[in-house]
């Protein structure tokens, strides 16, 4: 759990609203947001900033933004994707358990699933949902882990040169 002030300190953003409000989780999908989560609008095929009001209506207590006007509690940042990654880097430092990074051309998801199946009855383990193995999915996986996690299994995929190195900096 982070306060909005924590998010501002981590991202270098500017707070709009109540800095003491507590955020419990992060989502990039306004349809799937849970109560008191931080909504991070991402620019992709659709601009996530267009869905801030939906996220707030569905329970988000705060949102990041790099364009447009804030709605309720918000943090203004230069780039929402970089801010998401910065939050994940911060949270990763709070997780004291081991990180198992899975990379490769073929079989990443299968390997991740086998590792999870092998460890889940022995210890507290956290694993990515589906194939969350890119610059969005990896931070979301880290941000959804408990700080008490003993083994964090992260799948990392590359679409081009240097991408694994960038993901490793987050992990």
Regions found by a protein language model. Give the residues of each.
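Phosphate-binding loop of NTP-binding sites
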Residues: 84-171
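N-terminal leader/targeting and accessory segments in enzymes
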Residues: 1-86
């Amino acid at each position: 759990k982070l306060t909005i002030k924590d998010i501002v300190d981590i991202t270098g953003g500017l707070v709009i609203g109540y800095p003491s409000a507590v955020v419990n989780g992060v989502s990039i999908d306004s349809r799937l947001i849970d109560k008191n989560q931080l909504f991070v609008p991402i620019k992709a095929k659709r601009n996530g900033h267009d869905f801030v009001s939906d996220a707030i209506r569905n329970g988000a207590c705060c949102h990041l933004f790099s364009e447009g006007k804030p709605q309720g509690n918000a943090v203004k940042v230069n780039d929402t994707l970089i801010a998401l990654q910065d939050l994940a880097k911060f949270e990763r430092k709070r997780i004291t358990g081991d990180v198992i990074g899975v990379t490769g051309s073929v079989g990443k998801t299968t390997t991740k699933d086998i590792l999870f199946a092998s460890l889940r009855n022995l210890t507290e383990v956290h694993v990515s949902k589906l194939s969350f193995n890119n610059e969005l999915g990896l931070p979301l996986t880290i941000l959804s882990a408990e700080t008490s996690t003993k083994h964090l299994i992260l799948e990392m995929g590359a679409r081009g040169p240097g991408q694994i190195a960038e993901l490793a900096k987050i992990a």
